[in-house]
């Protein structure tokens, strides 16, 4: 495939990526 790691399309990684990014941005320590 073109993106084996799922860089272009990530159906299931979208939620994970969003939550991880938000946690990193809002609470890096993971308080929230």
Swiss-Prot record:
Compositionally biased residues, Basic and acidic residues: 10-25
Keywords from the UniProt entry: Cytoplasm, Developmental protein, Nucleus, Repeat
Protein origin, superkingdom: Eukaryota
GO cellular component, one term: nucleus
Per-repeat ranges for Sequence: 2-8, 26-32
Free-text disruption phenotype from the record: Simultaneous knockout of tal-1A, tal-2A, tal-3A and tal-AA is embryonic lethal. In embryos chitin secretion and formation of the cuticular exoskeleton appears to be normal. However embryos display a loss of denticle belts and dorsal hairs. Segment-specific epidermal sensory organs are present and segments form normally. The cephalopharyngeal skeleton is lost, and the head skeleton and posterior spiracles are deformed. In the developing leg, tarsal constriction occurs but the tarsal fold does not form.
Induction: Polycistronic RNA up-regulated by ecdysone.
Main location: cytoplasm
Signal peptide location: none
Described purpose of this protein according to its UniProt entry: One of four peptides (tal-1A, tal-2A, tal-3A and tal-AA) produced from a polycistronic gene that function redundantly in several developmental processes. Required in early stages of leg development for the intercalation of the tarsal segments during the mid-third instar stage and later for tarsal joint formation. Promotes the post-translational modification of ovo isoform B (svb) into its active form which in turn initiates trichome development and promotes tarsal joint development.
Name of the protein this chain belongs to: Peptide tarsal-less AA
Organism whose genome encodes this protein: Drosophila melanogaster (Fruit fly)
Gene label: tal-AA
């Amino acid at each position: 495939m073109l993106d084996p790691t799922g860089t272009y399309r990530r159906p299931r990684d979208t939620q994970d990526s969003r939550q991880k990014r938000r946690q990193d941005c809002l609470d890096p320590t993971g308080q929230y």
